[in-house]
């Protein structure tokens, strides 16, 4: 919306070069940024909108235009098929300086372009074609820059940076665009706000030394003599993040380096931590489901509901692997546990449109003869093709109404989510690999783990640059395969012309795979007839956080016994640290072990009576046992330190409701909606509270909002056929699961002068997912929709 209902001329969003006269460094940074390439100068976005308009018409594409295409939208051109206007100046403008700097206020944290714009009349002088008028404008600004600063750098932009960014970095879809219902898309704001990183989340596993906002990471200070400099520095308008695709397609080496440096700056860590005998029958646990209708993960912004799984008792482990001398026997099968931890990241990893990336954990084992004995997360075609389907992915896997994967950024057709796996800020994921030790293995195995990232996914890039419909029959037998707003049964071929694509060179780019973090350990190999290696641990005080991270990953997947065992190690190495006791209590609460939870949480309170997370979980314990007064007391201790923690507010409101203090509960729950108007739990409890107060109108209003945001539970039935066709994805869907190696070369040991003279015979290509002799491109061009990536 625009203040006063004014019309803003589209050229206002196309004249960033007028800013260059005084802000050259900032302009040059922006010129390479993803903001500049947000529109139809970005082939990935361009193709998604062309496909959208071909499928459901031009009108729904306006849903995206408010944040991606202001010049096109305000010129009234989004009713025209983009294919007809893609090379016009409006379509190539992207998000210019004026788009962000003319925002006068953010209306809410609901995102989806929920801001007010203000059109500064003096813009016409700044962008005048008359050089004398421009010179006069610039002279007046230099004479007194304060009015210019007040117009384009408003206080809320610094004071409420995250809310400012949320207006476009939090997204939902609804009936006008998907002909279905409200559903959450990506969401960088809520999980940041609810985490310890923001300084507003009380329940995080870790609190940072200092709260961080979006710009602290994504607009770091850089040296500059630009007129907007602060002590010789400006905030980078490269907006460094994770988009390696655009600078690759644009052949922009400086932007690509800035992005790669950002990705590898230590925001995440990988730790090959533990080794244990493989479980005979792994209990996978229940599939995690969210109450909110969402295609994205839900973090600390909602109360965790973890379904217990796995074995009744924890299996002893050998850990940490770099502290002991781990050994395996030839012929045995072992489990290797790798911990991925988010450290300096303020939102889920990965973030953004997580249905469209390749993000996965690779584990490779190579013996001292150079033989690869294990490989999960291999990339086909010598590292240029798709990632093998059995890898451990971090993404959202969605399907349309016919169970076809959402792999063309066709989010409007999403009807069900197969799984979402992202790592919350300040948390961890514990990944399990099942490794068979071959009989003919060397005397030492080196395990290498890499957290790999490729923007975009292989299939999405092929589609964006060369995708076109293959008119062969659909898997349902229809010719041509039907396309509707609810599903697309067509197959895709990557044979379209590259002429006129939005890239520097007319070719499909070979996108880099970035190793965001990695780790390496060595295992000794024992003869098959040697005694079985016994579990061994070495406890060092400096490793308390590694044990804690290991436990966090196990807790979040519902392996509660193993998580408890890990947290107990924390208390052994540092009994004065309350975190180990708190996390044992947190685990006991999930398990329903009230007595144990009370014991350990009271121990934690004795160590630090004011620690917010301890008070929250102790308050939750009191609530579970019906001691509502004590529960409220501990929740209020938390809120005195973290007044904007939504889950604590929701719990206090719930306690007041249970005590029939309806008016007090309403007051507390309204504070939740001030943080997020879409909070599902707040609407549910407000519905009940207003019903208790006899206010039928308000009760029905919150009931309607609750039902609007609540998940469509019946939609999960759609995933069944897809999961049957794609067992690797069904495995990944389970809260607790293991990954095995791709088929590897068969190695035969010949009798020779050296003990390990090696000859290698390769397994046929059919074992890697395609018929022998068929090219990978041909195989993927004729893949059925249910198997496309």
PLM segments and residue spans:
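Structural signature of tandem alpha-helical TPR/SEL1-like repeats
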Residues: 556-569, 576-579, 589-606, 610-613, ...
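Primarily the internal scaffold of c-type cytochrome electron-transfer domains
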Residues: 1-10, 26-55, 77-425, 431-441, ...
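TPR/TPR-like (Sel1-like) alpha-helical repeat modules
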Residues: 674, 680, 684-715
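Intrinsic disorder/low-complexity segments
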Residues: 748, 752-789
